[in-house]
Curated annotation (Swiss-Prot):
Signal peptide: none annotated. Possibly the antitoxin component of a type II toxin-antitoxin (TA) system. The keyword Acetylation does not apply. InterPro entries: AF2212-like, AF2212-like_dom_sf. This is Putative antitoxin AF_1084. Belongs to the UPF0165 family. It comes from the Archaea. Pfam families: AF2212-like. Keywords: Toxin-antitoxin system. Coiled coil: none annotated.
Amino acid sequence: MPKIIEAIYENGVFKPLQKVDLKEGEKIRILLKKIDVEKFIMAKLPEEKIRELERRFEDENLY
C-alpha cells in the first residue's frame, strides 16, 4: 500500500523525516514533490533547522 513520507535530500541521499517500515536493501519507488518551507514550520521543526533549509533552498535556487 502506498505511503507518503517527507524527506530531505542531502549529499545525494534522501533522508526520511520519520521512521519507515522497510527492510535493509528493499527497493522502493519514489515520487518527488517539492513542498514549501512553511509546512516545516507547521511540523514544529526547530527554528534553526528551518533557517538551514531556507538557506539550502536559496543556495540551490529552489525558492
